[in-house]
UniProtKB/Swiss-Prot annotation:
One BP annotation, GO: response to arsenic-containing substance
Record keywords, A-Z: Arsenical resistance, Cytoplasm, Disulfide bond, Oxidoreductase, Plasmid, Redox-active center
Listed EC numbers: 1.20.4.4
Localization per record: Cytoplasm
Species the sequence originates in: Staphylococcus xylosus
Membrane spanning stretches: none
Residues at the catalytic site: 10 (nucleophile), 82 (nucleophile), 89 (nucleophile)
Highest rank taxon of the organism: Bacteria
Catalytic reactions of this protein: arsenate + [thioredoxin]-dithiol + H(+) = arsenite + [thioredoxin]-disulfide + H2O
Similarity comment: family membership: Belongs to the low molecular weight phosphotyrosine protein phosphatase family. Thioredoxin-coupled ArsC subfamily.
CDD domains in alphabetical order: LMWP_ArsC
Biological classification of the source: Bacteria, Bacillati, Bacillota, Bacilli, Bacillales
GO cellular component: cytoplasm
Entry function: Catalyzes the reduction of arsenate [As(V)] to arsenite [As(III)].
Record-given protein name: Arsenate reductase
Length: 131
């Protein structure tokens, strides 16, 4: 069976999509290729790295990347994590499913917000896996 591909997209590929990529690789395992990208690149937020480190997932080697049209068109599912990404996501071919999981941006907020959003992302991916 070929691996499926999931592509997490947010505004800057800095916090939410980075954490989603980390959780996706952990939870979805070998059955999925997991990628993340942004409408823009803001660099990986150090607090996102720390939040994931707290749950023993290392995203310190991740890079902040722009949407790659090749990956986008080869994806089975594109998940937008914020309204900006949802509104500005490129047009997808008919074979690519899109879902919007609106999550609050923790950037610039208290540490507890990073933890809360991290845990919300984990729950969303666990629920997705059960479908």
């Amino acid at each position: 069976m070929d691996k499926k591909t999931i592509y997490f997209i947010c505004t800057g590929n800095s916090c939410r999509s980075q954490m989603a990529e980390g959780w996706g690789r952990e939870i979805l395992g070998e059955d999925w290729n997991v990628y993340s990208a942004g409408i823009e690149t803001h660099g990986v937020n150090p607090k996102a790295i720390e939040a994931m480190k707290e749950v023993d997932i290392d995203i310190s080697n991740h890079t902040s990347d722009l949407i790659d049209n090749h990956i986008l068109k080869q994806s089975d599912l594109v998940v937008t994590l914020c309204s900006d990404a949802d509104d500005n996501c490129p047009i997808l071919p008919p074979n690519v499913k899109k879902e919007h999981w609106g999550l609050e941006d923790p950037a610039g907020k208290e540490w507890s917000e990073f933890q809360r959003v991290r845990d919300e992302i984990k729950l969303a991916i666990e629920n997705f896996k059960l479908r």
